[in-house]
Amino acid sequence: MIQAIVTDIEGTTTDIRFVQQVLFPYARERLTPFLREHQQDEEVANALLSLRREVEQPDADIETLITTLHSFMDEDRKSTALKAIQGIIWRSGYLQGDFRGHLYPDVTPQLADWQQQGLKLYVYSSGSVDAQKLLFGYSDAGDLQPLFSGYFDTHVGAKREVSAYQNIAHQLAIAPQALLFLSDIRQELDAAQLAGWQTCQLIRDLPDSESRHLQVSRFDEIDIEGFTA
């Protein structure tokens, strides 16, 4: 019996185009001047320290780090430091009303229904926990943060690594077979399944012919009772 649902964001709750055409360009355009101005701010300084450790360049100056971050964005690297800095920049965008977090219309009602049924809801995304909270806190459906019991990012591991799902299950103290992971990416679901989780693939466009996971096109097509250990 499912006790908790963990959902991905990009391509699952949220149109991938919002991330790629709104969020990513917004951060890219502002990254250089933002870091030059705010490099001494505590949360920015901590992210830059993490970046120096990640690239094993403890003495790298700000211009070197800026170049590195732009390279990471070009590569779409799932860098924890990059995600933290993007999240800090996006915060100002949400607060200023430059954009609101996109959610597919089927998402909010179903999340609310699951919560009312007593299911715990969590988010696991490559984006930083702060960025996740911003997207759901300033979504086009309002502030949805009260629906969620917690958030996970790459601090628990990469989304295609089995150990990440083992870590989440351990932190939640819930048996893996009682956890359901929702994602649009087959390889992420493969990793969750190998960790003993239940899985469901959200297909917002064309079906994934290579996937062995249950596929649905909307959140309200997910039958929680259909998942058994």
Swiss-Prot record:
Q: What is this protein called?
A: Enolase-phosphatase E1
Enzyme Commission code: 3.1.3.77
Q: What does this protein do?
A: Bifunctional enzyme that catalyzes the enolization of 2,3-diketo-5-methylthiopentyl-1-phosphate (DK-MTP-1-P) into the intermediate 2-hydroxy-3-keto-5-methylthiopentenyl-1-phosphate (HK-MTPenyl-1-P), which is then dephosphorylated to form the acireductone 1,2-dihydroxy-3-keto-5-methylthiopentene (DHK-MTPene).
| Alphabetized NCBIfam families for the sequence | enolase-ppase
Query: Which UniProt keywords are given for this protein, alphabetically ordered?
Result: Amino-acid biosynthesis, Hydrolase, Magnesium, Metal-binding, Methionine biosynthesis
Which cofactors, if any, are listed as required? Mg(2+)
Q: How does it assemble?
A: Monomer.
Family annotation (InterPro entries):
Enolase-ppase_E1 (IPR023943), HAD-like_sf (IPR036412), HAD-SF_hydro_IA (IPR006439), HAD_sf (IPR023214)
Gene3D superfamilies, from UniProt? 1.10.720.60, HAD superfamily/HAD-like (3.40.50.1000)
Organism, per UniProt? Answer: Yersinia enterocolitica serotype O:8 / biotype 1B (strain NCTC 13174 / 8081)
Query: Which protein family is it in?
Result: Belongs to the HAD-like hydrolase superfamily. MasA/MtnC family.
Q: What PANTHER family has UniProt attached to this entry?
A: ENOLASE-PHOSPHATASE E1
Q: Which GO terms describe its molecular function?
A: 2,3-diketo-5-methylthiopentyl-1-phosphate enolase activity; 2-hydroxy-3-keto-5-methylthiopentenyl-1-phosphate phosphatase activity; acireductone synthase activity; magnesium ion binding
- Pfam families the UniProt entry points to: Hydrolase
Q: In which pathway does it act?
A: Amino-acid biosynthesis; L-methionine biosynthesis via salvage pathway; L-methionine from S-methyl-5-thio-alpha-D-ribose 1-phosphate: step 3/6; Amino-acid biosynthesis; L-methionine biosynthesis via salvage pathway; L-methionine from S-methyl-5-thio-alpha-D-ribose 1-phosphate: step 4/6
